[in-house]
Amino acid sequence: MASVNIKPLEDKILVQANEAETTTASGLVIPDTAKEKPQEGTVVAVGEGRVNEQGNRIPVDVKEGDTVIYSKYGGTEIKYAGQEYLILSARDVLAVVSK
């Protein structure tokens, strides 16, 4: 995972999506047009967290390097330095994958 010069704001998270499966369990090749949009990725950068009404910063529950599962249609896709990323709100992250 390369370092990126993008710093998400507040409770936003920068994620690099993991590659979608290219073959089925039985060995059939899945064409690009039939591939599911990936819902798993690696956290590349994390914002400092949002500020509540009392002025306290609430930190984000994930950290750089975490593998996360996120909402299928959440986030904004961006392209930076030839790489594709997703900027997600912390609310779009559904789970952290344990290794």
From Swiss-Prot:
SMART domains to which the protein is assigned, alphabetical: Cpn10
- Coarse class of the primary localization is cytoplasm
Return one Gene Ontology term, BP aspect. Answer: chaperone cofactor-dependent protein refolding
Note the superkingdom of the native organism: Bacteria
Q: Where in the cell is it found?
A: Cytoplasm
GO CC annotation, single? cytoplasm
The record's keywords, sorted A to Z, are: Chaperone, Cytoplasm
Q: GO MF terms on file?
A: ATP binding; metal ion binding; protein folding chaperone; protein-folding chaperone binding; unfolded protein binding
* Main function: Together with the chaperonin GroEL, plays an essential role in assisting protein folding. The GroEL-GroES system forms a nano-cage that allows encapsulation of the non-native substrate proteins and provides a physical environment optimized to promote and accelerate protein folding. GroES binds to the apical surface of the GroEL ring, thereby capping the opening of the GroEL channel.
The subunit field of the Swiss-Prot or TrEMBL record says:
Heptamer of 7 subunits arranged in a ring. Interacts with the chaperonin GroEL.
Recorded family membership: Belongs to the GroES chaperonin family.
Q: Which PANTHER family match?
A: 10 KDA HEAT SHOCK PROTEIN, CO-CHAPERONIN GROES
Protein name from the UniProt record: Co-chaperonin GroES
* Protein's organism: Rhodococcus erythropolis (strain PR4 / NBRC 100887)
